[in-house]
Amino acid sequence: MKIAYILLAHNNPSQLKRLVDSLKNTGDFYIHIDKKSDIRPFKQVFEGMESVHLLEKRVKVSWAGWSMVVGYMLALQAALENEKNYERFVMLTGQDYPLMSNEEIIKTFEDNRDVEYIMAYNIVTSSVPTDKNKILKRWYLDNPFRSRFLQRAYKGIMYRVVTRPFSGKELRVPLNGKLVDPYFGQMLSAFTRKGAELLMDTYLHDKKYNKKMKTVFAAVEIYWQTLFFNSELRQNTVQHGEEHEITEHFGWAPLHYHHYYVDTSVFTEEDFDELKDCGYMFCRKMVVGKSEGLMDKIDEMRREK
């Protein structure tokens, strides 16, 4: 099983190195470092590691902005173009950490070669009132400024002038020449090569879809979700189609254990017992200065498996 890990990261090179080391010998890593960040410390920690590919082409990434999609697509494109012909493409962030052993990770993917690890629900039929605003309002979340003061000012102005007063009427989005229902789910997914090629082909060629996705809220949680659940691959997903109701443990991330409903959502050593038996492949998020003890315990657990 040839695995390519597709990552976005922006800080803490040592933590990213620890994540990569924990998955050593399971696959290769294609990493987009936020253009706002100095890439030199990342190059230093990964010097001599042939399995790690730090992208030369980078963009400035803003939370929930279209730029997050672009960052992932640049990394995915590099992996697809590699002559190794990868069979599985796993999307991660620099704050993730594996819970399964490397042997378990490989076996899971080998035993489920045709499964698209993605989950989502239909925004049109969603019972959550704010879901529809992700599509109906125009969001401009890619911030051109470095200064936090200017970032806050830009965000406030764009919301007051563009987002709040504007509301469209069409919930469906243009995809492959027709209007389809949009879907929402976690960005962290894992695709077969067929799925990854479908995603890349859409990104490179469907201009109307891309134009619409540039103004939705958190495109990275709508872009491939809408694509997959309006394609023939929807029956190959972990739920064999969309989720039909909002569950108590929000997540829609088939491989990641994540307290999505908690603002801080940082795991610490106190969470070890909860994580060790959760059954997920990965967890997020880990933060330097808070999660080292937990990662030490997870490392020990993974060695014993």
Roles of regions detected by a PLM:
Residues 1-305:
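ER/Golgi luminal nucleotide-sugar-dependent glycosyltransferases, focusing on the catalytic module
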